[in-house]
């Protein structure tokens, strides 16, 4: 039997860090495996489930053979993601036979059991108690008088030097192509004190980079009734004082985002914004039920760069949205030329069960979507290549992710794990370790990656 499935990199249009877990097992100790699919928000859910189970005396298995049962935390955002989640469930059933399904696809239990009737239980997203109940029913915890005397150490599914920090759950937007509010509910922000306490513990444990995630990071705290109009601002400021790199993901383009830029210019928060613009033509954005002000967005981008010249802008876009004409797509290409975004992801539109966009007229043919995706990525690649070439000869700070006999794989402040590029050190890397932060001189640039040497 093999190791459990690694997260497919194409499962979701966002981060998909690889699952690596290992835990020593006592003789007779009940053991659970975990396959965690999809985005970092789901990964955090997996970490919480495993932390609770380990506190109850369960061991965590890195492979199917060593597990008494396997939890599959699924993704259900796109039809292609559902298909890959079903494939992962099928693999777990073949390799282990005792499978508990949770996560976004679990919100459709009939869909799951229709494909895999032998699963032990199906629970929805962030239903931690139901998952634990299902585990208890399948693999009862072994009596251990010492477990309750030991503090529960959090299980992390990322390398030790960076960690995802989920600050809220749910979303209040009604984008026609998205069903996240249906699956995960309306915005529910975690108390600032709880977020900061978790962040402090992570930094104390050696985390050098905090990746702030949610469905809508810039809306954090707007579900509260309090004197602070935009609570993400004081939260970001306090996180920045912990001494770790702080990277903001999934920032919806509200006007108050401009107030985060001074924190980046001061060095409290990394000069990096991950903002899903989705498109640039106003009519397409209206059909998406997104803000339709692409020209004003260009003005905002110019202001961000004026106030923080080192800022890196990442965004994602959808091509082939229902009704998208060639002229509307060309507007997107022209906008990309003007915006000169540093990091770009692009996805061909897919129908999602339950999404209102499915009912829109004039769906784009698959071959046209592919052709537009190719053209978009060709332009985005050229922009990336030119921007990276301009960094040759500069000295920049990097964090080390991996070191082997061939060299060190690092990231700059402009690069998030898994979705952005890397900086490679081929010489002078002896003595480096994951989590080290050092200065390098950039010697070579490619389309998405850099090469350099320590200085």
From Swiss-Prot:
Q: Which InterPro entries match?
A: Elp3/MiaA/NifB-like_rSAM, Methylthiotransferase, Methylthiotransferase_N, Methylthiotransferase_N_sf, NA-bd_OB-fold, Ribosomal_uS12_MeSTrfase_RimO, rSAM, rSAM_horseshoe
At the top level, the lineage of the source is Bacteria
Radical SAM core domain span: 157-386
Q: Which reaction does it catalyse?
A: L-aspartate(89)-[ribosomal protein uS12]-hydrogen + (sulfur carrier)-SH + AH2 + 2 S-adenosyl-L-methionine = 3-methylsulfanyl-L-aspartate(89)-[ribosomal protein uS12]-hydrogen + (sulfur carrier)-H + 5'-deoxyadenosine + L-methionine + A + S-adenosyl-L-homocysteine + 2 H(+)
Annotated transmembrane regions = none
Q: What compartments host this protein?
A: Cytoplasm
Q: Which gene encodes it?
A: rimO
Q: Which UniProt keywords apply?
A: 4Fe-4S, Cytoplasm, Iron, Iron-sulfur, Metal-binding, S-adenosyl-L-methionine, Transferase
For this chain's record, the cofactor binding note is:
Binds 2 [4Fe-4S] clusters. One cluster is coordinated with 3 cysteines and an exchangeable S-adenosyl-L-methionine.
The question of whether Iron-sulfur is a record keyword is answered with yes
Q: What is its EC number?
A: 2.8.4.4
A biological process from GO: tRNA modification
What are the residue boundaries of the MTTase N-terminal domain, all occurrences included? Answer: 30-140
Swiss-Prot/TrEMBL cofactor(s):
[4Fe-4S] cluster
What is an example of a Pfam family matching this protein?
TRAM_2
Q: Which family does it belong to?
A: Belongs to the methylthiotransferase family. RimO subfamily.
> Could you confirm whether the keyword S-adenosyl-L-methionine appears in this record?
yes
Q: What is this protein called?
A: Ribosomal protein uS12 methylthiotransferase RimO
What are the top taxonomic ranks of the organism? Bacteria, Pseudomonadati, Pseudomonadota, Alphaproteobacteria, Rhodobacterales
Which annotated residues bind [4Fe-4S] cluster 1?
Answer: 39, 75, 104
A cellular component term, taken from the record's GO annotations: cytosol
The residues that the entry says bind [4Fe-4S] cluster 2 are: 171, 175, 178
Q: What top-level class of enzyme does the UniProt entry assign?
A: transferase
Which residue range or ranges hold the TRAM domain? 389-455
């Amino acid at each position: 039997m093999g190791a459990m499935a690694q997260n497919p990199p194409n499962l979701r249009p966002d981060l998909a860090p690889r699952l690596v877990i290992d835990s020593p097992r006592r003789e007779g100790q009940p053991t659970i495996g975990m396959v965690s699919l999809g985005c970092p928000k789901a990964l955090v859910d997996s970490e919480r489930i495993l932390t609770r189970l380990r506190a109850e005396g369960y061991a965590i298995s890195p492979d199917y053979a060593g597990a008494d049962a396997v939890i599959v935390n699924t993704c259900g955002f796109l039809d292609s993601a559902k298909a890959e989640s079903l494939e992962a469930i099928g693999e777990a059933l073949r390799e282990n036979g005792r499978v508990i399904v949770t996560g976004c696809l679990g919100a459709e239990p009939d869909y799951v059991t229709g494909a895999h009737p032998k699963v032990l239980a199906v629970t929805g997203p962030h239903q931690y108690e139901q998952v634990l109940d299902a585990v208890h029913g399948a693999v009862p915890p072994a009596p251990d008088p010492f477990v309750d005397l030991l503090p529960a150490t959090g299980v992390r599914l990322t390398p030790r030097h960076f960690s995802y920090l989920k600050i809220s759950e749910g979303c209040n937007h009604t984008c026609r192509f998205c069903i996240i509010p249906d699956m995960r509910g309306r915005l529910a922000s975690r108390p600032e004190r709880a977020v900061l306490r978790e962040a402090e513990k992570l930094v104390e444990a050696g985390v050098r980079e905090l990746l702030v995630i949610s469905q809508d990071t810039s809306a954090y705290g707007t579900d509260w009734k309090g004197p602070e109009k935009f609570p993400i601002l004081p939260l970001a400021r306090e996180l920045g004082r912990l001494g770790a790199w702080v990277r903001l993901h999934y920032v919806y383009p509200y006007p108050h985002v401009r107030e985060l830029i001074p924190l980046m210019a001061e060095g409290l928060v990394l000069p990096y914004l991950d903002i899903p613009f989705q498109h640039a033509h106003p009519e397409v954005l209206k059909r998406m039920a997104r803000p339709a002000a692409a020209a004003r967005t260009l003005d905002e981008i110019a202001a961000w760069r004026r106030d923080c010249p080192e800022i890196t802008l990442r965004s994602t876009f959808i091509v082939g949205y229902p009704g998208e004409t060639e002229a509307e797509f060309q507007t997107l290409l022209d906008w990309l030329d003007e915006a000169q975004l540093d990091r770009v992801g692009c996805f061909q539109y897919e129908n999602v069960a339950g999404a209102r966009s499915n009912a829109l007229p004039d769906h784009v043919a698959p071959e046209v979507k592919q052709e537009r995706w190719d053209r978009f990525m060709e332009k985005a690649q050229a922009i990336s290549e030119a921007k990276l070439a301009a960094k040759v000869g500069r000295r920049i700070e990097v964090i080390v992710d991996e070191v082997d006999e061939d060299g060190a794989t690092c990231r700059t402040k402009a690069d998030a794990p898994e979705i952005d590029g890397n900086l490679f050190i081929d010489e002078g890397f002896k003595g480096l370790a994951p989590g080290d932060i050092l200065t390098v001189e950039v010697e070579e640039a490619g389309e998405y990656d850099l090469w350099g040497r320590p200085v």
